[in-house]
């Protein structure tokens, strides 16, 4: 990770280390498979082992520098791009993850918070991820997070972010998100108090979850890592949330996080068990919050109509994710997640700043994309906590965008697919919950934040999220599209002032698109879009007060249903056109087509008319081309027949006899016969010069 900025680290650099690590830990089968898959050879006995590198990372002093969020995301993005550049990288990382799990299990002391469950979770996740995640990148990231993890015990909130970084591209994004959270506590005394109070719980839940999750996420940059990261982030976020609603909020996020971990890998028994145990205490503490009615019922109750639709969206997303991964576990975990999210949301509604935290934490729980996006917003949220409205707006757009980003990854990237399979449900749920929280916060806080803050943050978040989301070339393409969409969203935001609301719209469109691309069903995406639109419609009235009508309010303000229908149609068309394409781009393209294409089409239609057309009756029979047609030429009778017999005076001429012989001779033999006639005893008689001459009258 640290070396990434100086020198581009290639995943193949770690193959020998991973192979040696696997063999050292009696993982011969995995080692053999890894060697076949990567063609790696045993490293030198004198070379440093993964354990040595890991211990060095723990001792490294470079970790604290990564807290910087301004430039950190870019570096992380570059790292993520490097890690996700090769599918082999992903496989290597997964295998490394498998190795590291054992390794980390062996070296729990180093891990600081690494419970045996973490190693087990890592192993299970790595196996379930099928060595498809980037082991090398993850290991590097893990190492860094481990270092951070050591500090995290001191600072529970900070530890989860760093661990998230260590996890994978996802962990990177999550770490980015979390650093902002750390900043938030510093910025806001309330959050600091929450951290101080919550730290014990966060330290327990966050370190355990963070470590277990970090292990699982690092074990596979795929869904497991994303879900784990999100859980870690949730744990971290929950402490922050706990500030206003310390126990309940933190517990609810933890619940969501634990459910995501289950989703991330159904095979992760140890991790899921630990999470469940954590969930139980968390649930007990949240009590009324956790007892929030099922997502379907409470959303309508909540002032923001967007929440129920979002929850519905979450449900739909879980269904889709369940298709990829264990359906039951995803749905159940999603359901569990939803109540906590609702609790958090309700709390958020009551307290906009907590809501922001909750939204951020939920976004963290979402994939690294969402977490990164959240990080950028979370920074502003922390920094501009005084202007909680701004953070709310920024968080809202980032949260929505992250949600969209995870969905796109699901549609486009291989890792994304795996992530979605394992943690797509958790990501989607978290993203949806984040969106709900953010939307609620926006509605409740009625962000007065200037569109500029929202725009700048969303822009940064969107690119970060997109880069994070890409662990493969496919994902990268989707990321670029996401970035573009986010940029477009940002652009639109300045136009319509309501930065928060505008970003949410593109995010929802992206979400819908990603879901439809996932092949869950265009209906699901449309429903989600509708829900989002509805939610947007409800919060917009509130948001307009602070921000004025946003792009969403402009398009959907008149009627959420109309906008929903339009968006659904557009999304469906967009899904058909290109899964990775951003809805905004498509919308723009559609608008351009409506304005330009018709003319172009008309021109095209008209152009054929400019060429002369043959009359149907004039069709000429197909015949070989003749430059000179016999029927069109008049030949002088004197020249019409050029044979010797046709000449005047031919009869009785000296050449008549020769003609009798030569007229039947063709080709090479003709010259031979002619020569014989000239040299032989042939006597034709007197020669008349005038016999064959023809005089043409000059005309």
Curated annotation (Swiss-Prot):
Q: Name one GO biological process term.
A: mitotic cell cycle
> Where is the region Interaction with RPA194?
204-382
Q: Where is the composition biased (Pro residues)?
A: 291-301
At what positions is Phosphoserine found? 87, 90-91, 362-363, 366, 397, 456, 508, 538, 563, 580, 582, 622, 643, 686, 698
On assembly, the entry states: Heterodimer; heterodimerizes with TCOF1 following monoubiquitination. Interacts with RNA polymerase I 194 kDa subunit (RPA194) and with casein kinase-II. Interacts with DKC1/NAP57, NOP58 and fibrillarin.
Where along the chain is composition biased (Basic and acidic residues)? Answer: 627-637
List of residues that carry N6-acetyllysine? 33, 415, 663
Per the record, residues carrying Phosphothreonine are 188, 607, 610
Q: Where in the cell is it found?
A: Nucleus, Nucleolus; Cytoplasm
Pfam families reported in the protein's UniProt record: SRP40_C
- Domain (LisH): give its ranges: 10-42
Recall the taxonomic lineage recorded for the source organism.
Eukaryota, Metazoa, Chordata, Craniata, Vertebrata
Q: What does this protein do?
A: Nucleolar protein that acts as a regulator of RNA polymerase I by connecting RNA polymerase I with enzymes responsible for ribosomal processing and modification. Required for neural crest specification: following monoubiquitination by the BCR(KBTBD8) complex, associates with TCOF1 and acts as a platform to connect RNA polymerase I with enzymes responsible for ribosomal processing and modification, leading to remodel the translational program of differentiating cells in favor of neural crest specification.
- Region (11 X 12 AA approximate repeats of an acidic serine cluster) residue ranges read 84-566
The protein, known as: Nucleolar and coiled-body phosphoprotein 1
Segments for region (Disordered): 65-637
Organism whose genome encodes this protein: Homo sapiens
Q: Where is this cross-link: Glycyl lysine isopeptide (Lys-Gly) (interchain with G-Cter in SUMO2)?
A: 67, 76, 186, 193, 342, 347, 390, 396, 401, 407, 415, 440, 452, 505, 579, 604, 613, 647, 663, 695
The UniProt similarity line reads: Belongs to the NOLC1 family.
The cellular component terms of Gene Ontology attached to this UniProt record, alphabetical and capped at eight, are: Cajal body; cytoplasm; fibrillar center; nucleolus; nucleoplasm
Polar residues compositional bias, start-end = 381-397, 547-556
UniProtKB keywords? Acetylation, ATP-binding, Cytoplasm, GTP-binding, Isopeptide bond, Methylation, Nucleotide-binding, Nucleus, Phosphoprotein, Repeat, Ubl conjugation
Q: How is it modified after translation?
A: Undergoes rapid and massive phosphorylation/dephosphorylation cycles on CK2 and PKC sites. NOLC1 is one of the mostly phosphorylated proteins in the cell.
């Amino acid at each position: 990770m640290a070396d990434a900025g100086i020198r581009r680290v290639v995943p193949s650099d770690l193959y020998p280390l991973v192979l040696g690590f696997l063999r050292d830990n009696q993982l011969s089968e995995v080692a053999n498979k890894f060697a076949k898959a990567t063609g790696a050879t045993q490293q030198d006995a004198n070379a440093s082992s993964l354990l040595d590198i890991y211990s060095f990372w723990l001792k490294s002093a470079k970790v604290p520098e990564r807290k910087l969020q301004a430039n950190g995301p870019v570096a992380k993005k570059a790292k993520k791009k490097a890690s996700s550049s090769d599918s082999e990288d992903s496989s290597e990382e997964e295998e490394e993850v498998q190795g590291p799990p054992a390794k980390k299990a062996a070296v729990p002391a180093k891990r600081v918070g690494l419970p045996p469950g973490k190693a087990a979770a890592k192993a299970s996740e790595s196996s379930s991820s099928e060595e498809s995640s980037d082991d090398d990148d993850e290991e590097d990231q893990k190492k860094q997070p481990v270092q951070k993890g050591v500090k995290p015990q001191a600072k529970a909130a900070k530890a989860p972010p760093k661990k998230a970084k260590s996890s994978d591209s996802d962990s990177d994004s999550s770490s980015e998100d979390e650093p902002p959270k750390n900043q938030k506590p510093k910025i806001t005394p309330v959050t600091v108090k929450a951290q101080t109070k919550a730290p014990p719980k966060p330290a327990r839940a966050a370190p355990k979850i963070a470590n277990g999750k970090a292990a699982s996420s690092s074990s596979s940059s795929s869904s497991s890592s994303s879900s784990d990261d999100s859980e870690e982030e949730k744990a971290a976020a929950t402490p922050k949330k706990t500030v206003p609603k310390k126990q309940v909020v933190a517990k609810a996020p933890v619940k969501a996080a634990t459910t995501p971990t289950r989703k991330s890998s159904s095979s992760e028994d140890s991790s899921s068990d630990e999470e469940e145990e954590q969930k139980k205490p968390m649930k007990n503490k949240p009590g009324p919050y956790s007892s929030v009615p099922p997502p379907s019922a409470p959303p309508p109750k909540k002032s923001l109509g967007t929440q129920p639709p979002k929850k519905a969206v979450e449900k739909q997303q879980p269904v889709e994710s369940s298709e990829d991964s264990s359906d039951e576990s995803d749905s159940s975990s999603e359901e569990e997640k939803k109540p906590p999210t609702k609790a958090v949301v309700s709390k958020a509604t009551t307290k906009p700043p907590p809501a922001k935290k909750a939204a951020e934490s939920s976004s963290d729980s979402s994939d690294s994309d969402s977490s990164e996006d959240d990080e950028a917003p979370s920074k502003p949220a922390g920094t501009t906590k005084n202007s909680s409205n701004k953070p709310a707006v920024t968080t809202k757009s980032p949260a929505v965008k992250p949600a969209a980003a995870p969905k796109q990854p699901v549609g486009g990237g291989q890792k994304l697919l795996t992530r979605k399979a394992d943690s797509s449900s958790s990501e989607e749920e978290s993203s949806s919950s984040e969106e709900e929280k953010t939307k609620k916060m926006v509605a409740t806080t009625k962000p007065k934040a200037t569109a500029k803050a929202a725009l700048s943050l969303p822009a940064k978040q969107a690119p970060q999220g997109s880069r994070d989301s890409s662990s493969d070339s496919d994902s990268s393409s989707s990321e670029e599209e996401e970035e573009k969409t986010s940029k477009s969203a940002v652009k639109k935001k300045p136009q319509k002032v309501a930065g928060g609301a505008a970003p949410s719209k593109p995010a929802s469109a992206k979400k819908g698109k990603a879901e439809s691309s996932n092949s869950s069903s265009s209906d699901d995406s449309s429903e989600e879009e509708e829900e989002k639109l509805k939610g947007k419609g409800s919060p917009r009235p509130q948001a307009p007060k602070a921000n004025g009508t946003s792009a969403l309010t402009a398009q959907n303000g008149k009627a959420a249903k109309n906008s929903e229908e339009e968006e659904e149609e557009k999304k469906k068309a967009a899904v058909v056109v290109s899964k990775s394409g951003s809805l905004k781009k498509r919308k723009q393209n559609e608008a351009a087509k409506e304005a330009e294409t018709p003319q172009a089409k008309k021109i095209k239609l008209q152009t054929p008319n400019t060429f002369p057309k043959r009359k149907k009756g004039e069709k000429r029979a197909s015949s070989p081309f003749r430059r000179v047609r016999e029927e069109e030429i008049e030949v002088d009778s004197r020249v019409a027949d050029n044979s010797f017999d046709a000449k005047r005076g031919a009869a009785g001429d000296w050449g008549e006899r020769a003609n009798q012989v030569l007229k039947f001779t063709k080709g090479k033999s003709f010259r031979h016969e002619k020569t014989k006639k000239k040299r032989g005893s042939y006597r034709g008689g007197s020669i008349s010069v005038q016999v064959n001459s023809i005089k043409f009258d000059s005309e």
